[in-house]
Amino acid sequence: MTQDKQHKNDMYGNIDARSESDEGVLPPIPAATVVLLRDSEESYEVLMLKKNSKITFGGMWVFPGGKIDPEDYGEESDLEYAARAAAVRETKEETGISLDSKDFIHFSHWTPPPGPQKRFATWFFIAKSAGVKSVEIDEGEIKDHQWIKPSEALAKHSAGDIDLVPPTWITLHHLSLYEKLDDVLGHFSKAT
């Protein structure tokens, strides 16, 4: 009997064999990301960033974001407040784009299954880029960027041209169901 080949993006392995209480299971690290959207001539686009191949999620295409730092809480003890602050901070660090967390729409929250690998419990927000003229990547953590239609990003992933982690793929899939940016924002504004 042959063993199934593991897909290169399968970082979770056999999730049915583990639980949070197992020895060696690392606790999830709180994190946040912003799915930044803009109108385009045909439809709308999402900002994707390519991670440096030498760091966590190396070579993957992701949305701007990162872990929640203690200072992101400010005087608040609210995790969503801290997640929004982290998303603003990380987006500025990675792209040079300044955002206001009041413009964020809560989209989803992902926590990977238990395991020995580093894992992030991530808040996903969506926001419309208002007047963003340029993206200034840091050339350290981030090596490339692209504004792309969600359906085109999925097609590139399917062709093996870009790598996506499962939450990014699913987010792009949800977005690809909408033709216009106003429809995306309208739907998810009502859903939260």
Map each language-model feature to its residues:
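N-terminal leader/linker segments that precede catalytic domains of diphosphate-processing enzymes
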Residues: 1-142, 146-192
